[in-house]
Regions:
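Short, intrinsically disordered C-terminal tails of secreted or membrane-associated proteins
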Residues: 480-485
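Positively charged N-terminal leader segments that act as targeting/secretion signals
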Residues: 431-467, 471
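Hydrophobic alpha-helical transmembrane bundles of multi-pass membrane proteins
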Residues: 2-434
Length: 486
């Protein structure tokens, strides 16, 4: 009998006993559990658990739609509350339909492509379970339909970013018309470049764990374009350049929206681990949850302190945006950093969102909820912050193959193991130094002169710890490139 399966079934029996099942009934349940367990393989159980985890994570991300709705309704004027709520509920339905009809097949096409092929309407046939039953090393570890559900709520998230930025200025039907284009074409195409096996992921090794760039920066870029087109709200900016604050009508509602988003982000980042049925995957999910929570906390306090220093008092809206900025910042890689580094990444995000909001006001770019700053400015920081704990994210620079987690593998995920955090921490400074110096030296004739010195800096006194060995290899590859210069 499979011991793993038996453990789960015995746990269920124990739970039943706790709720008043008699000893005789419990014995019958144990016998039934043993009979069921004898016919279930570990692969089947892992498949069921990973699929269930995927679906629950997707449900958490869907709940973020409520968070965006509450946040935006709280930060706009009361006369526009119904309109902003209507936009949010309608955009979610629009995103689901467009991603079903076009978007999903656009996003997941042939590897290495710049433009996707055209294959309309998602097929409801799911042969993943058959493959699991057949066994083999390439057996998937979750249902492909659960993957669609998880991805479609990401699309709705990207479009929700746009709705807040253009609040109080864009008519409903014009907004929904853009939502059709955004969710059916724009988001899937740029998502295909990376997550869908396109050129960014396959050729350049671009790393974005849960979508700081793919989801949040995409939504912010679209929001910025629309905000520039529709212009600021009437009365927002005076003729002499002064900024006239337009406070939100319901800050308690905005705070509720922040906490809903904070909660949903655990599914957003945690679900992007793609599996939970193995020990490694379960530990990774726990690490992602902790780092996500710490980054949000760091971002909130950083923005709150910045407001205190700048305005002389605490500002709730800045604190809310600081928490969201911390979440966006850690989304690109919530797995690799330590909890302390994740907090620091969130702190930088909180500072950046404060500065960005004030800077956009100077440019007379009116963003009622701070969406462009939270998801755009901090989204860029999140993508760059990947290098702080994961040097492999830039392996394409010197031609090294990038280690990545496969789209589908066995339940144990044996093909993908994270680098120990201690090795990552020790090698971060050396790797960053070699990358930056190598990029510069490759382009100048003096590279041959400074190449050997670069190698010595990266490999001080011949010490060959694991991170230094990796860094020395990078330096050697850079030097070989330098020697090819004319």
């Amino acid at each position: 009998m499979n011991r793993s399966v038996m453990k789960w079934l015995m746990l269920a029996v124990g739970a039943g006993a706790a709720f008043g099942v008699s000893a005789q009934e419990a014995e019958v349940m144990v016998e039934a559990a043993a009979e069921v367990a004898s016919g279930i393989s570990t692969a089947e159980l892992a498949y069921a658990l990973d699929t269930f985890y995927f679906l629950v994570s997707g449900a958490f991300v869907m709940w973020m739609a409520a968070g965006f709705s509450m946040l935006e309704a709280g930060l706009v004027r009361s006369k526009n509350t119904v309109e902003i709520l209507t936009k949010n509920v309608a955009l979610f339905a629009t995103a689901c339909i467009m991603y079903l009809l076009i978007g999903y097949n656009f996003m997941y096409t042939e590897a290495g492509m710049y433009f996707p092929g055209l294959d309309l309407i998602l097929s409801m046939e799911d042969h993943a379970a058959d493959v699991v039953n057949a066994g083999g090393e390439d057996a998937p570890y979750y249902s492909s339909l659960s993957d669609f559900f998880f991805q479609v709520v990401f699309v709705a998230t990207a479009m929700s970013i746009v709705s807040g930025a253009v609040a109080e200025r864009m008519k409903l039907w014009a907004f929904l018309g853009f939502a059709v284009i955004m969710t059916g074409f724009i988001y899937p195409i740029q998502g295909m470049w990376s997550w869908g096996g396109g050129f960014l992921g396959e050729t350049f090794g671009y790393s974005d764990y849960a979508g700081s760039g793919i989801v949040h920066l995409c939504g912010a870029a679209a929001a910025l374009a629309l905000v520039i087109l529709v212009g600021p709200r009437k009365g927002k900016y005076a003729a002499d350049g002064r900024v006239n604050p337009i406070p939100g009508a319901n800050l308690p509602l905005a705070a509720l929206g922040m906490f809903i988003l904070w909660m949903g982000w655990f599914g957003f980042n945690g679900g992007s681990e793609l599996a939970v049925a193995s020990v490694d995957s379960a530990n990774n999910v726990a690490r992602v949850f902790v780092n996500t929570n710490m980054a949000a906390s760091g971002g909130l306090l950083a923005a709150l302190l910045m407001a205190k220093f700048r305005f002389g008092k605490a500002d709730l809206t800045m604190a809310i945006n600081g928490a969201l900025a911390g979440l966006v910042a850690i989304t690109a890689d919530p797995l690799s950093p330590s909890a302390g580094l994740a907090t620091l990444i969130g702190v930088v995000g909180g500072v950046l969102v404060f500065v960005s909001i004030l800077f956009l006001d100077k440019l007379k770019i009116d963003d009622p909820v701070g969406a462009i700053s939270v998801h755009g400015t901090v989204g860029i920081w999140g993508v760059l912050a990947v290098l702080l704990a994961n040097g492999d994210a830039t392996s394409w620079v010197c031609g090294l193959p990038k280690r990545k987690k496969p789209k589908a593998s066995t339940s144990s995920n044996a093909a993908w193991k994270p680098i120990p955090s201690s090795s990552r921490a020790n090698g971060t400074v050396n790797a960053a130094r070699s990358y930056a110096a190598g990029l510069l030296l490759r382009r100048v004739e003096w590279g041959r002169v400074f190449g050997p010195a670069l190698f010595r800096v990266c490999n001080v006194d011949g010490r060959q710890s694991a991170p230094r060995q990796a860094t020395a290899l990078h330096c050697q590859l850079f030097i070989s490139e330098l020697e090819r210069l004319p």
